[in-house]
Amino acid sequence: MAVEHSAHYERMSLEEYLALVEQDPEHAYEYLDGRVYMMTGGSPDHSIIGSNLNGLLQAFLRGRRCIVYNSDVYVQLSDHYRACPDATVSCDPRDRGAQEVIRYPSLVAEVLSPTTEARDRGQKSLQYRSCPSIQEYLLISSEFPLVEVFRREKQGFWSLYTLGPGDTIELSSLGLRFPVADVYQNASFLEEANE
């Protein structure tokens, strides 16, 4: 999710966290094992990349049983973890009609920012990969064209595919392929490199 705000919160119980979310619906708060992180908007490139990815997913999945969500929707990973990925896909009928929380995502993606990258690669990555419904997890750089696709294989282990300019992203859980360049269309760092 976007960028961590400077607000610092002491450890909270789940009940205290839920009360905070209810009291302040204008902000998103991630809850990671008792620690609360207020999330705010990221850089323009972060927004462009997230919008591009969500648009690609939405266009492909239109009319199918899967739903694409942006970072406005929480993903509940357990009683101790609630995150706001930049893109989430759920194909599970139990998530249809969910108002605020998705519990059975098949794919999640995080657009990395300097303030959240360590958490996205560490604690959240472990939680995403321990969620039985998640088949693919993407980490997308917001500073240069680099996409990492973590894929759950049939044997239960995870494979990592690191992709750059000229490569094609394959999301096998959805049957979707698209160029890395499509995710980065209109990103300012690409335009600056071409000037």
Task: Outline where the language-model segments fall.
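Gly/Pro/Ser/Thr-rich low-complexity, intrinsically disordered segments predominantly at protein N-termini
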Residues: 1-195
